[in-house]
């Protein structure tokens, strides 16, 4: 009998989340013998006090440092939601340590565009800038909006929702307004996977299909909302650990 392959996995959280968002998935992967890192990006999670240092470059460095410190040499790096805009920077920093990049319900910016410019409608951008101006250049959505947009496949009273909502922190505006340089990413031609969530209200299925096409891949579909690391842990773990 062939022993299962132990994988190195780095989990990159999205907007307003932290490394804590991956706790259920990380436990599942570690139980099966995989090595997992789920760093907090600057301004998030246990690093929420570093909000003023948040940038795409700082995000990418935090992920690269986590992989290096763990001694990973062939890592699967998973970027969720806004984390998709972080992966090109990570690829440029540590290409030799990456086996595959996985975009999970993630934005895939076109070269030279910003996350807000490429993903959010003009009205949505106006709203987000207004929220940021009122909150020290960081965006905090109302809790009901966060639930419906990110966790709509779970009842509002579900423990996974009630545990998550209080842990969400204001999202620094700056990384969302920085232009993403995709040239090095495209030149590296690293293996990529896109996972599309069919009940996603944040990265809708048609938009996710556009992002997958931008990567030149056919998306893998999951029947869930935006946060499968909460609502579809086993299925997500299986996908991540059976990629070539």
Label each residue range with its predicted role:
Residues 197-230, 243:
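Conserved loop-alpha-helix segment in the C-terminal half of the alpha/beta-hydrolase fold
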């Amino acid at each position: 009998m062939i022993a299962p392959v132990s994988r190195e996995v780095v989990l990159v959280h999205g907007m307003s989340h932290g490394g804590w968002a991956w706790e259920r998935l990380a436990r599942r992967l570690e139980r099966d013998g995989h090595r997992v890192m789920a760093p907090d990006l600057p301004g998030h999670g246990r690093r929420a006090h570093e909000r003023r240092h948040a940038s795409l470059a700082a995000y990418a460095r935090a992920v690269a440092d986590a992989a290096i410190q763990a001694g990973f040499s062939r890592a699967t790096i998973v970027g969720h939601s806004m984390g998709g805009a972080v992966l090109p920077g990570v690829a440029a920093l540590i290409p030799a340590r990456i086996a595959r990049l996985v975009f999970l319900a993630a934005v895939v910016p076109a070269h030279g565009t910003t996350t807000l410019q490429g993903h959010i409608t003009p009205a949505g951008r106006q709203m987000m800038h207004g929220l940021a101006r009122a909150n020290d250049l960081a965006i905090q959505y109302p809790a009901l909006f966060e639930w419906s947009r990110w966790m709509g496949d779970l009842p509002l009273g579900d423990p996974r929702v009630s545990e998550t909502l209080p842990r969400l922190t204001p999202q620094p505006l700056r990384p969302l307004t920085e232009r993403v340089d995709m040239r090095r990413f495209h030149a590296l031609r690293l293996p990529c996977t896109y996972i599309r969530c069919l009940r996603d209200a944040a990265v809708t299925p048609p938009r996710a299909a556009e992002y997958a096409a931008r990567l030149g891949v056919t998306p893998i579909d999951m029947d869930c909302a935006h946060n499968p690391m909460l609502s579809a842990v086993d299925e997500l773990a299986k996908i991540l650990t059976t990629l070539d």
